[in-house]
Curated annotation (Swiss-Prot):
Entries under InterPro entries matching the protein: DUF1508 (IPR010879), UPF0339_domain (IPR051141), YegP-like_sf (IPR036913)
Sequence repeats: 10-58, 61-109
Gene3D superfamilies documented for this protein: 2.30.29.80
Keyword list, A-Z: Repeat
Highest taxon of source: Bacteria
Keyword Repeat: yes
Protein name, per record: UPF0339 protein YegP
SS bonds (residue pairs): none
Family assignment from sequence similarity: Belongs to the UPF0339 family. Duplicated subfamily.
Gene this chain is encoded by: yegP
PANTHER family: PTHR40606, UPF0339 PROTEIN YEGP (PTHR40606:SF1)
Length: 110
């Protein structure tokens, strides 16, 4: 099954999206946006940037866990991954975003 985006609205009227893999696992979480239109632009940015290896910033948290940020051409963070135990599992997460990030399916939960 192909991945999809889920768009949601928080209790303080901000918007965020997540990218889900085909198995339902969240593989990328956006920053908060003040408008739905901005969040939708963020989804469009994931679609255009996720296939490009150079858009992934690989990081290590202070607790030793691994994660990545997907960045736009202007170096702004579009979304961040979960924490991974190993660098290899982080690479698997990046590969999943590359495959699922071009999805045209958006489940609007706003």
């Amino acid at each position: 099954m192909a991945g999809w985006f889920e768009l949601s609205k928080s209790s303080d009227n901000q918007f965020r999206f997540v990218l889900k893999a085909g198995n339902g696992e969240t593989i990328l979480t956006s920053e908060l946006y003040t408008s739905k239109a901005s969040a939708e632009k963020g989804i469009a940015s994931v679609r255009s940037n996720s296939p490009q290896e150079e858009r992934y910033e690989k990081k290590t948290a202070s607790n030793g866990k691994f994660y990545f940020n997907l960045k736009a051409a202007n170096h702004q963070i579009i979304g961040s991954s979960q924490m991974y135990a190993t660098a290899q599992s982080r690479e698997t997460g990046i590969a999943s975003v590359k495959v699922n990030g071009t999805s045209q399916t958006v489940k609007d939960n706003t």
